[in-house]
């Protein structure tokens, strides 16, 4: 691990249920948080995952959240969610995130006896604002990539070209009377 030389005076606080409102408010105003990180959603599987979510403060101001759980000597971000990773304030810079990772490693090793971190990033397509400081920090800390998942998206305004097979199947559906229409009658 590469030591970070700047002392940004970051502090880690382990999340407790009393901090739910603060957590949820932060997620709602972050640059990369999604509904998956709201506590009601996260706590749905609380019986299956030993929650060890963390809150990072800089000078008394909440700057980042890390939804996480631990199992044996491994910390996951977060095993009960589709994706995890640091949820960042608009004030979180690359330097702050690098320092947060360094502090995270020290904290987990010293406090929780964790020897391994499995970090899953938030796919960029879900960001409210471009935010890949965590990827840079992982590179700087010589993290090892063990898995790569794909994220694909179709932007409705731009459309997506259909393949020949898809066009043929759409034509068959129309010929068989299939119609897609919008309806407000939900009782039907």
Where are these regions (language model features)?
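Short Pro/Gly-enriched beta-strand edge/turn motifs at strand-loop
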Residues: 33-41
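Conserved donor-binding loop and adjoining core beta-sheet/short helix segment
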Residues: 5, 25-28, 40-111
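A residue-level signal for conserved active-site and pocket-lining positions in enzyme catalytic cores
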Residues: 23, 60, 119, 180
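Short, internal active-site loops enriched in acidic
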Residues: 122-127, 159
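Conserved GNAT acetyl-CoA-binding A-motif
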Residues: 112-123
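Acidic-and-aromatic substrate-binding clefts and catalytic sites of carbohydrate-active enzymes
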Residues: 94, 125-130
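Acyltransferase donor/substrate-recognition loop-hinge adjacent to the catalytic core
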Residues: 1-20, 131-188
